[in-house]
Amino acid sequence: PDIGLITNYGKAHLEGFGGFEGVIRGKTEMFDYLTQNYGHIILNNDDKLQIENCKGDLAVTFGENQDSEYTFKYIKRDNQLILKSEDYEFRSSIYGDYNFSNIASSISIGKFLDLTNDEIQKGLDIFKNDSNRSEIIQFGSNKIYLDAYNANPTSIKAAISNFDKEVI
């Protein structure tokens, strides 16, 4: 690869990596490869583990941390997640605070590849939740939140913590 991004170091795929430390080692191998081969690394500057495990001259950072190249402020308004950058408010229909870094990483890659803000927003607009990821299913007067694809302890905890913060 020429560009690499790790959204986070979650407790997924533990069985294949021999534990959480193995997940960190395995995911960090991509950073090592990119550093050795002059690739570009997009880092979540709000994730201390990523900052500790990746040191490269070609790293670009994103996050709420003001030291990031791509800085975003997280806002909930009009039943949407909004990421405000220096020059644009990106809107997404995806629910859940835990999706902030997913959306911010997507926007950052678009900016890194010189897409315009409107082109990036168009991509966010056409994205549809499916495949058991961040889906909201209306069943009569009830809402079902379906976020079970490849569920793991980290993803389940994040999904449950958002029930009391629902804005949709």
Please name every model-derived segment.
Residues 2-143, 165-166:
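Acidic, Mg2+-coordinating active-site environments of NTP-dependent enzymes
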Residues 129-132, 148-168:
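Active-site beta-alpha connecting loops in nucleotide-dependent enzymes
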